[in-house]
Amino acid sequence: MSANVPEMLDAWRMVAARRRFDGRIPLSAMTRLQGSLVDTDGECVYSLQFDQDPLLKVAYVELSIDVELPLACQRSLQRFLYPVQIRQRLGLIRDEADEAALPAEYEALLVPEDGMLRAVDMVEDELVLSVPVAPVAPVAPGSEAIDAEWVPTQEEQDKASPFAALAALKKQ
């Protein structure tokens, strides 16, 4: 994790001070995410901006994440880099009942009683949610479009339909 980002952040003090933190986290430091990755090569670039909405009086942290996750393509079983760019505004709430009061554009983040948050956990939570169930590389070998139009040959067209006999019986 970056040297200028404390491991634990007091959410309410950060909101009052309108603090911003920019950091980097190696993928190897995110233990819950590792099971979804092919390997842990690379790092995640993120920023946290604590603030309060002046009109709605909602305390929030704006989370920005840029990373390329090494995933296994489910078509080719080859490693590929899945680009992830997240811009999420998390409304800070003290109690689950406060979630209903949040505007639609805010995602709720329940702050523990002591007010302390871990930046790594917030970033990792969003990355775990961003991993697709069945990742597919955008240009995986063998994933090219197949010609959907099938034109029958003349021989097939000339052959009598097996249903023609049924049609004749139906007319009788």
Language model regions located:
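A positional/architectural concept
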Residues: M1-P70
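Charge-rich, low-complexity linker and terminal segments
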Residues: M1-R18, E43-V45, L81-Q172
